[in-house]
Each structure stands twice: as C-alpha cells, then as structure tokens.
C-alpha cells in the first residue's frame, strides 16, 4: 500500500490539526498579556530539549500541547525527545518550540515527520525555522562537543527516491520543483556567528555540510569514509526533511549541529593483523550522544536565545 497521500488527504489532515491547536491557543491570545502568534519554530535535537528552559515563564507563560493529543501528530519514541509543542516567548520574540522531533526510522513517513511544519504554515505567522540536531563528526578537524552551522546538505535518502516532496505537490505551500542551492539563510548564519562572538563562547563553531542518512544504525567505517569523500562534514538522521519542507513553505532556515561523537573512517581491523585495533574503538552509542548533548547544552541554549532576540 502506498504511503503517499493525495492533496485532499494532506489538506484534510493539516487543517484538522491546525484547528485543534488554534482552539487551544485562542483563549490565550484573548486573555493573556503579550501572548502573540509565533514567528519562529525551533526544533530541538537529541539531548537538546533544554532549549525550552529559555522560554519566558511569565509574561506570557508557555502553553504546552503534547503531540499525542494533536490529530495526525505522531509521538516521538526516542530518548531525549519529549514530544510536545511549546508556545511562548524567548528573549522577547514569540516562538513555538518542538521539544522532540520525529524520525523516519521510528516508522514514520516523511509526510508524518514534517507534518508539524505543514500545520504551522497553515496556521500562518511562522516564517523562520531554527533546527538543531546531534550529529557525528566526519570532518577530521571536528571534535565531540564542537558546534557546526549548516550551510549545505547531502540528502542521501532523497537522492535514492525517499524525498519529503515526493508525491502530489501542495501548490498553496510552494512550487513543484524547489531550488535548494541556498537552503540555509545567509543572514541568519551571519547572525549566529555574530552572537557566538558576542557571547564569547569558547566552544568552536564551524560551518559545514550536513549529511542526512535514514538510520537507525550508526555509520560503518566505509560509509563514513564515503561521506567524507563526498564533502560531508557531519552526519545525522534528521533535519534535512524538515529543512526542505520549511523552504517549500517559503520559510528562512537556520540549522545548528552539535557534534556529539566523531565517526571512524579508518579501515576495520584485519583478520590477518596480529595486533588489530580494538573493535570498540570509536563505536558510537545513543548514550554518548545524550551525554555530550548535556555537556554542550548551555552554550547551545544561550546561542539560540541570543539569535531569537533579533527575530
């Protein structure tokens, strides 16, 4: 059975979810001082849900809507992704925060993983996407807990036919054939580096190409070597589908990776080698991803909040 919905089915699902969220928010727009429709969506990556602590707790307090309550939304099943929409204000700017994202490897279709963006676009107001992720470092200069501002991407599943815009086009949102040569907004990237300097963050902030793979397995040595040869600086299992759909909707995009582990590109141990490299060397785990997310989380939170003050 095809997982591709026709335009009417997509629109029906989007409209139903948007109506549910709007009904929850409407009383707050009417009765809460300074509660405004969000202009920016922030998506929190693995272990980076602490960004929500930067939401104003009063004037106005945040409004939380669990994914599982919203028609058509899927619940995140991955540790480090709580699964809530949070509407509020960050550094004086109205925002909606996805505390936990959806992944294809959880069994979701690409329409389902990017569904929140379609819904928020239908509701209006949101025009910016700030997306964060935990990624493996491919570039030899990158170390665990470094940061990388994404300026381009490699969409490996997309090149093989698994693309978020595959199927009937939603003409009201964007064009059938979308140009992505400048998917990551230059002015927002400049703003990120400006705030990094102003905050005097000691953690390195690189600029590079993110490679999207479907997961859930971490990369083999040969795959990591291939990605490096193709020009990838980091690799992860998210972000690119959301970026593509946001650009399809005409949003500006800023994307930030936290390098939580370094990928192994050396050849595997040989059965003919009398002193092989230990097999455990360089092996990535999700626990490592979450732990390094905690280590760097304060810098990520402060950086995102500083950027929000300019939006």
From Swiss-Prot:
Residues given in the record as a purine D-ribonucleoside binding sites: 219, 261
Modified residues (Phosphoserine): 275
Catalytic reaction list: a purine D-ribonucleoside + phosphate = a purine nucleobase + alpha-D-ribose 1-phosphate
Pathway where this protein functions: Purine metabolism; purine nucleoside salvage
Source species: Saccharomyces cerevisiae (strain ATCC 204508 / S288c)
EC supergroup of this enzyme: transferase
Function: The purine nucleoside phosphorylases catalyze the phosphorolytic breakdown of the N-glycosidic bond in the beta-(deoxy)ribonucleoside molecules, with the formation of the corresponding free purine bases and pentose-1-phosphate. Cleaves guanosine and inosine.
Residues modified as N-acetylserine: 2
Alphabetized GO MF terms: inosine nucleosidase activity; nicotinamide riboside hydrolase activity; purine-nucleoside phosphorylase activity
Annotated protein name in UniProt: Purine nucleoside phosphorylase
InterPro entries attached to this UniProt entry: Nucleoside_phosphorylase_d, Nucleoside_phosphorylase_sf, Purine_phosphorylase, Purine_phosphorylase-2_CS
Keyword Transferase in record: yes
GO CC terms, sorted: cytoplasm
């Amino acid at each position: 059975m095809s997982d591709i919905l026709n335009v009417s089915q997509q629109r029906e699902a989007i409209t139903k979810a948007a109506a549910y969220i709007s009904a929850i928010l409407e009383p707050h727009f009417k009765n809460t001082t300074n509660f405004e429709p969000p202009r920016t969506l922030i998506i929190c990556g693995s272990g980076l849900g602490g960004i929500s602590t930067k939401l104003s707790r009063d004037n106005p307090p945040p409004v939380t809507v669990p994914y599982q309550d919203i028609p058509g939304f899927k619940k995140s099943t991955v540790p480090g992704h709580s699964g809530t929409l949070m509407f509020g204000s960050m550094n004086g700017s109205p925002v909606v925060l996805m505390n936990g994202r959806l992944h294809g490897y959880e069994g979701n279709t690409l329409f389902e993983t990017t569904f929140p963006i379609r819904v928020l676009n239908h509701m209006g107001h949101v025009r910016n996407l700030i997306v964060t992720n935990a990624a493996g470092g491919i570039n030899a200069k990158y170390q665990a807990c470094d940061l990388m501002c994404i300026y381009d991407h490699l969409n490996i599943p997309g090149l093989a036919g698994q693309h978020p815009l595959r199927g009937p086009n939603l003409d009201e949102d964007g064009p059938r054939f979308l140009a992505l040569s400048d998917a990551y907004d230059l002015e927002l990237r400049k703003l990120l580096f400006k705030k990094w300097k102003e905050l005097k963050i000691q953690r390195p902030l690189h600029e590079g190409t993110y490679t999207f793979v479907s997961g859930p397995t971490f990369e083999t040595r040969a795959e990591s070597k291939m990605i490096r040869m193709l020009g990838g600086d980091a690799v992860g299992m998210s972000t690119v589908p959301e970026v593509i759909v946001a650009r399809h909707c005409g949003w500006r995009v800023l994307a930030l990776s936290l390098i939580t582990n370094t990928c192994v590109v050396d050849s595997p141990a040989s059965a003919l080698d009398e002193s092989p490299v230990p097999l455990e060397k360089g092996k990535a785990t999700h626990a490592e991803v979450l732990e390094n997310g905690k280590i760097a989380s304060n810098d990520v939170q402060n950086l995102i909040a500083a950027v929000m003050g300019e939006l």
